[in-house]
């Protein structure tokens, strides 16, 4: 969601409005009991060394991963913290589709970058679990519509589709999967070999 918000002004405004509403609702709540050591904890946090602007800029610099510098500079800054510490291993799933799993320490979901070459198509597939996708670069279409940079979509079991990148450029997406995809048609014989890499 944070990645989508980086692309969508309207959604950022909506989140800001919801944060303001939440603050207003908190002012109407009854006072809560506070722990005896809350003041000491707060003062300790205030005394802790603060990160400087240079530290923040360094943390958000272009990731030092196996992404090409051109693509890395276009990724949302939120993703840089995951990509700075690892080499991405791109695997070819078809002649026009590659995937690179991103290790985030999660065991129930896989976070990955998917790249469909310009004019390329992913195999027709269903979903064994939930798939959340944000388009980071380029665009693709499927049976339900066209998705451009910043667009967010969700697929569930029974949602069969075949993403196709536009002819003018490759499409890079960030996806979160709760289970591997399920190939359909003649390629379904490959399903036992589909890897799922939550980490």
Spans of features found by a protein language model:
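A short glycine-rich, His/Asp/Glu-containing loop-to-beta-strand
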Residues: 87-120
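Ligand-binding loop in jelly-roll beta-barrel domains
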Residues: 159-183
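Double-stranded beta-helix
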Residues: 174-199
């Amino acid at each position: 969601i944070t990645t989508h918000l980086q692309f969508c002004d309207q959604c950022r405004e909506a989140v800001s409005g919801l944060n303001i509403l939440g603050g207003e609702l908190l002012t109407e709540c009854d006072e809560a009991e506070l722990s005896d050591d809350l003041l000491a904890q707060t003062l300790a946090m205030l005394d802790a060394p603060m990160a400087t602007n240079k530290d923040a800029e360094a943390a958000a610099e272009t990731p030092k991963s196996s992404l090409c510098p051109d693509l890395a500079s276009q990724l949302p800054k939120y993703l840089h913290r995951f990509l700075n510490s690892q080499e991405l291993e791109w695997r070819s799933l078809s002649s026009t589709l590659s995937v690179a799993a991103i290790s985030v320490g999660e065991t129930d979901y896989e976070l990955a970058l998917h790249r469909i070459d310009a004019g390329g198509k992913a195999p027709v597939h269903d979903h064994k679990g939930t798939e959340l996708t944000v388009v980071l670069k380029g665009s693709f279409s499927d049976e339900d519509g066209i998705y451009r940079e910043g667009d967010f979509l969700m697929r569930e079991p029974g949602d069969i589709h075949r993403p196709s990148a536009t002819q003018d450029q490759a499409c890079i997406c960030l996806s979160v999967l709760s289970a591997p995809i399920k190939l359909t048609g003649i390629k379904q014989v490959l399903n036992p070999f589909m890897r799922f890499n939550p980490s």
